[in-house]
Amino acid sequence: MTNIRKTHPLLKIINSSFVDLPAPSSLSSWWNFGSLLGVCLGVQILTGLFLAMHYTSDTATAFNSVNHICRDVNYGWLLRYLHANGASMFFICLYLHVGRGLYYGSYTYSETWNIGILLLFAVMATAFMGYVLPWGQMSFWGATVITNLLSAIPYIGTDLVQWIWGGFSVDKATLTRFFAFHFLLPFIVTALVMVHLLFLHETGSNNPTGIPSDPDMIPFHPYYTIKDILGFLVMLTALATLVLFSPDLLGDPDNYIPANPLTTPPHIKPEWYFFFAYAILRSIPNKLGGVLALVVSILILAIVPILHMSKQRSMMFRPLSQCLFWLLVAVLFTLTWIGGQPVEHPYIIIGQTASALYFLIILFLMPMTSMVENYLLKW
């Protein structure tokens, strides 16, 4: 008798995706981040759902409702900090997942890669709108500054900003619509994740060598299910440690001050996971130029497959490209640090240098290095 998991219309989809899926035998721990992102998304949706039961999206009561959740709701403080720090964990896993794709050449699966870029934008939009909801000082001013960037768009900019705000400033209408979209977007993200997996399973997984692994495949269960569960335990332990010992480590103290349109915080900045993009934005003195650089800094991922000049897919056997990749990582860490610093000397020049290096490495140095490596292979 055939196993029910192979015949049942619903179970056979799950079976072909998570049980009998043929997977390369050489996948390292860098391949754990996809499943970790799935867990992060689940944690965020669950904690967010329970927070939404107690939150009120009104400028008069939003700050107090978050206060009420932390003080009066059973384990409300735990839900709130799991949700806030869960977002940080989400982005850590997201950036490591993208980094893995860049290092091992996973971007050659163009459909999967492009859906991934869409996912990155959707998650960033969700996180930005979530940061506005507690209605603290940094929530209000962050929303004002970031949405105001759209006014740099020629001709329609000002009208577009006022349309997003629902008035002439960030106010009740803005908060209400941000809450609505913040609730909706994670479900759109979930749908995109399914499309992402659909395209991935059309081609099968890449592997660290970048060499086709068709002759050497193993079933996903039990080998990679066990490996993923270990990843879950490590990540959830790290998240629990952060939430229970220093929940405000990655937050901004200014967000414990209720939003006040009459006083501006000394340094307006977004959450830490946007610092690298914020540093690139600030490194260009022109408003429109800065906005374009900000968008291009992430959209540049879409042209990475076109810039792939190497005869090898993975960087595993390309030491020169490896050096450049780790230089790029160092540049991104530098940009993240600069994004959280005030706009003054020497941070301005460091930010501008790091921004220039970021684009230089991806657009010129990496393709040129790949061509040099191709030439060296002939020897």
Curated annotation (Swiss-Prot):
PROSITE patterns reported in the protein's UniProt record: CYTB_CTER, CYTB_NTER
Binding-site list for heme b b566: 97, 196
GO BP annotations listed: mitochondrial electron transport, ubiquinol to cytochrome c
Pfam families documented for this protein: Cytochrom_B_C (PF00032), Cytochrome_B (PF00033)
Main localization, broad class: mitochondrion
Binding site for heme b b562: 83, 182
GO cellular component term, pick one: mitochondrial inner membrane
Subcellular compartments: Mitochondrion inner membrane
Keywords of this entry: Electron transport, Heme, Iron, Membrane, Metal-binding, Mitochondrion, Mitochondrion inner membrane, Respiratory chain, Transmembrane, Transmembrane helix, Transport, Ubiquinone
GO MF annotations in UniProt: metal ion binding; ubiquinol-cytochrome-c reductase activity
Cofactor note: Binds 2 heme b groups non-covalently.
Keyword Mitochondrion: yes
Binding site for a ubiquinone: 201
Chain ranges passing through the membrane: 33-53, 77-98, 113-133, 178-198, 226-246, 288-308, 320-340, 347-367
Family annotation (InterPro entries): Cyt_b/b6_C, Cyt_b/b6_C_sf, Cyt_b/b6_N, Cytb/b6-like_sf, Cytochrome_b, Cytochrome_b_C_euk/bac, Cytochrome_b_N_euk/bac, Di-haem_cyt_TM
CDD domains per UniProt: cytochrome_b_C, Cytochrome_b_N
Protein family according to the UniProt entry: Belongs to the cytochrome b family.
Biological role stated in the UniProt entry: Component of the ubiquinol-cytochrome c reductase complex (complex III or cytochrome b-c1 complex) that is part of the mitochondrial respiratory chain. The b-c1 complex mediates electron transfer from ubiquinol to cytochrome c. Contributes to the generation of a proton gradient across the mitochondrial membrane that is then used for ATP synthesis.
More about this protein: Heme 1 (or BL or b562) is low-potential and absorbs at about 562 nm, and heme 2 (or BH or b566) is high-potential and absorbs at about 566 nm.
Subunit annotation: The cytochrome bc1 complex contains 11 subunits: 3 respiratory subunits (MT-CYB, CYC1 and UQCRFS1), 2 core proteins (UQCRC1 and UQCRC2) and 6 low-molecular weight proteins (UQCRH/QCR6, UQCRB/QCR7, UQCRQ/QCR8, UQCR10/QCR9, UQCR11/QCR10 and a cleavage product of UQCRFS1). This cytochrome bc1 complex then forms a dimer.
Protein name, entry field: Cytochrome b
Organism the protein comes from: Artibeus glaucus watsoni
